[in-house]
Amino acid sequence: MTRIRRGYIARRRRTKMRLFVSSFRGAHSRLSRTITQQKIRALVSAHRDRDRKKRDFRRLWITRINAVIRGNLVSYSYSRLIYNLYKAQLVLNRKILAQIAISNRNCLYMISNEIIK
């Protein structure tokens, strides 16, 4: 059987992969087999961390809201605020509440005092 050298198609495929990993260090940007492995690994990490980012931001928002709310009343916490928001049928998500908590604390205090009543 004769040997097939794979020609320009394989070269184009490898060049495309090399462009993806061009910023990697050492053999990870030079050798075809390790390029393939590192590309797969990078894509897996990117996919995992996109989900992780959503969790991390939600935790950050909750921490910010809780820190500001505890400064207002003696025995008031994040969980009570969220419970009272749902009870009052106010639709404010955690991202918006965190932005209000950072930029305008008095506004958040007013919201929390109104829903307590």
Swiss-Prot record:
One GO term describing the cellular component: ribosome
Subcellular location: Plastid, Chloroplast
Key words of the record: Chloroplast, Plastid, Ribonucleoprotein, Ribosomal protein, RNA-binding, rRNA-binding
Gene Ontology terms, MF aspect: rRNA binding; structural constituent of ribosome
Annotated GO biological process: ribosomal large subunit assembly; translation
Superkingdom, natural source: Eukaryota
SUPFAM superfamilies: Ribosomal protein L20 (SSF74731)
Protein's job: Binds directly to 23S ribosomal RNA and is necessary for the in vitro assembly process of the 50S ribosomal subunit. It is not involved in the protein synthesizing functions of that subunit.
Family: Belongs to the bacterial ribosomal protein bL20 family.
Protein name per the record: Large ribosomal subunit protein bL20c
Organism placement in taxonomy: Eukaryota, Viridiplantae, Streptophyta, Embryophyta, Tracheophyta
